[in-house]
Amino acid sequence: MRWRKYIDFDVIHLLVGAIVGMGLSSCQPEMPVISTITVEADGLTVPVNPDLYGLTIEEINHGIDGGLYAELIQNRSFEDGVPPLNCPYDAARNVLITPNGWTIPFMRGDSVPGWRRIVPNTQIYPDMKELVNDKNRRSLLVAVSTSGESGRGGVIAEGYRGIPIRKGERYDLSFFAKGANMVPRTIRVALEDSMANTVLSDVFQVAPLYEWKRYRHTFTATEDAPNAVLTITADTSAVFWLDVVSLFPEGTWKGRKNGLRPDLAALVDSLAPRFIRFPGGSFVEGYTAGTYPIWRETLGDISERKHFWNVWAYGTTNGMGYHEYLQMCEDMGAEPIYVINSGITSQSRRPRYED
């Protein structure tokens, strides 16, 4: 079978003309394009469901602990410095190494952020043996050696860059203490100025025995101070342990116990969110087992709540837990949207770790 061969010159002429035309047009200067956008704000064009307007609240950059949550004591249970399970500490780089090889900033195991000695005659040690309960993994051992010249000794809680107090306002203190001396030693607890030179409240005195006991007191501030501290001191040589040291302003949002800062909560409320999504995104993903919130571990007394080193490289108390979030949503008239971990950690932080 023979194929017929032919050339269609009309088609060739058409193609050549198109190519030449395109070349010529590309050589022409571009003409300015003038566009006009008209916005008609009067009247409803497309209805928008008002329930689509809401907020996401996440524990990041101390947005909760040290922010919205009204707790004034940083590292109240002395858990900062306890590495998560299967995450060894690299002392040379001050990082944790996760099971999948990702690193996250950390600190030395003997560090006690948020706390310091009041004078050199005091030694402080994180203790992993004397514990209030099985939920807490460390307490603070305080050893004071005093003399007529050295004066009192003890520890200072600095809060989050200072503890802001106002004259006449009340602050609720609670803490666990346990003594080690044959004869109970008196320890004094007070609010003082940042240098611990001037007392700014009444003084609370206790003499802890051999058993753990929770003590409670309500201070009344005698002066305004933006950066006060909480001091726990002894005038004689003494050895004692502390744990779950908490200080709350009595005036929380809506007067809730274990509640929110009224100024920040009022700002959130002023946005009138129809829903609140909590407790975050990457915070919920975590980076290994035990480094993301599980709702049932954020309930109950603050001494029973699980603490962990979060994905943003600081300690999380879970003091603002599932109940407190629901309470906040109720107080603000917002629908709660709780974010749960699916069992897979953040994909952006090396290969996934499945729990």
Regions found by a protein language model. Give the residues of each.
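Active-site loop/turn elements of alpha/beta-hydrolase fold enzymes
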Residues: 341-343
